[in-house]
Amino acid sequence: MLDLRYITENTEDLKKVLELRGFKEIGIIDELKSIIQRKREFQKEADILREERNKASKEVGKIKQSGGDITKISASVKLVGEKIKEIESKLEQEENALLNINLGLPNILDPKVPPGKSEHDNIVQYEVGKIPTFQFVPKTHFEIGEALHWIDFEKGVKLSGARAYTYWKDGARLERALMNFMLDVHTKEHDYTEVWVPSMVNDESMMATGQYPKFKDEFYRIDKDELNLIPTAEVPLTNLYRDEIIPEDQLPISVTAHTSCFRREAGSYGKDTRGLVRVHQFQKVELVKFCKPEDSEEEHKKMLSHAENILKKLELPYRVIILCSGDISANSSITYDIEVWMPGLNRYMEISSVSNFRDFQARRGKIRYKSKDGKNQLVHTINGSGLALGRTYAAILENFQNEDGTLRIPEVLKSYF
């Protein structure tokens, strides 16, 4: 959802952004400008008529006091009132049309975002850690997990169908250890406040963060109760401050939560059908920040370093890439992905996305702060995975495997076992 002034004053720039994103309905911007213009004209006409009605109403009062006949002027007031209702109805129609189009528009791109059409055009920023070498052919995480009897995919499928799994014994303990380790680092070292949030949210929450209305088919919904299973803790964490005005001296606010996440993975048929990479339910530790606009770039960098710090402590090799215009999410202005090395799969795999949304979500969710001069302004929101537990789990299995089938546990996790 974009600023209407920006749309009207930067039409050609906006069209270029949409083209870079691969947005096909470029002509909708001209339609949007026409709606904005009609809305202004209706608003102006309604204001003039209200002023006319107010003057006439005062005149009615004066005539009444003097004992005169108000029949004619009362009829005139009534007629003006009917015209106002008619214009207000048209105004409401234009406002609804405006909102529907604006809710479907993607965010403005940061100038640093490289042009491109797909993930193949993303640019590697840097690599961290040494890729391990093995004196044997490394196994995949699902082979290791099944051999250790830590992961049982068959029982997961029996319970929930495809893309499901169960953890057992030390395998279950490893997942719990990762959760506690990540939360401890983020709360004790990175100064985030831990929050426990619901796994079901209302439509307003999904709308504010940008999942609805455009991507409604990608998520699980409980129609009877009008609730949605969260695809990420970004949704409930960001909506903690929906429709609120935050005092300036409370910013920046940094919150974190561990939750289950639920995704239909409707567009991923045939991709990563085995293992923990692409599943319908997974655990994740999420990071969200609310800050002043002038601080968002620096806070974005900080969050990226916080997510990286988890991988550094776990001694997992990774790289950071910047997403191109054709691969970045519609809601984000700029996104850095962290990809961890997977020896068994013999490729890098996304383990975290860290995004700056600028005021895109704040405008949808009416999340504002009151500045020292008393003005209400939109905050900027930033979010990132810190990290996805299942993929971190998979990376540990593949990077810390031994030739005899045993597994080494990262030093930082040993105290959690």
From Swiss-Prot:
Record GO terms (molecular function): ATP binding; serine-tRNA ligase activity
Function of the molecule: Catalyzes the attachment of serine to tRNA(Ser). Is also able to aminoacylate tRNA(Sec) with serine, to form the misacylated tRNA L-seryl-tRNA(Sec), which will be further converted into selenocysteinyl-tRNA(Sec).
NCBIfam families: serS (TIGR00414)
Enzyme Commission numbers on file: 6.1.1.11
Protein name per UniProt: Serine--tRNA ligase
One Pfam family cited in the UniProt record for this chain: tRNA-synt_2b
GO annotation, biological process: selenocysteine biosynthetic process; seryl-tRNA aminoacylation
Assembly, per entry: Homodimer. The tRNA molecule binds across the dimer.
Location within or outside the cell: Cytoplasm
UniProt family annotation: Belongs to the class-II aminoacyl-tRNA synthetase family. Type-1 seryl-tRNA synthetase subfamily.
Pathway as given in its UniProt record: Aminoacyl-tRNA biosynthesis; selenocysteinyl-tRNA(Sec) biosynthesis; L-seryl-tRNA(Sec) from L-serine and tRNA(Sec): step 1/1
Entry's free-text remark on domains: Consists of two distinct domains, a catalytic core and a N-terminal extension that is involved in tRNA binding.
Recorded name of the encoding gene: serS
Superkingdom as given in the UniProt entry: Bacteria
Residues in the signal sequence: none
Reactions listed under catalytic activity: tRNA(Ser) + L-serine + ATP = L-seryl-tRNA(Ser) + AMP + diphosphate + H(+); tRNA(Sec) + L-serine + ATP = L-seryl-tRNA(Sec) + AMP + diphosphate + H(+)
Amino-acid positions noted as binding ATP in the UniProt annotation, renumbered to this chain: R263, R264, E265, V279, E350, I351, S352, S353
Main subcellular location: cytoplasm
PANTHER family per the UniProt record, alphabetical: SERINE--TRNA LIGASE (PTHR43697:SF1), SERYL-TRNA SYNTHETASE (PTHR43697)
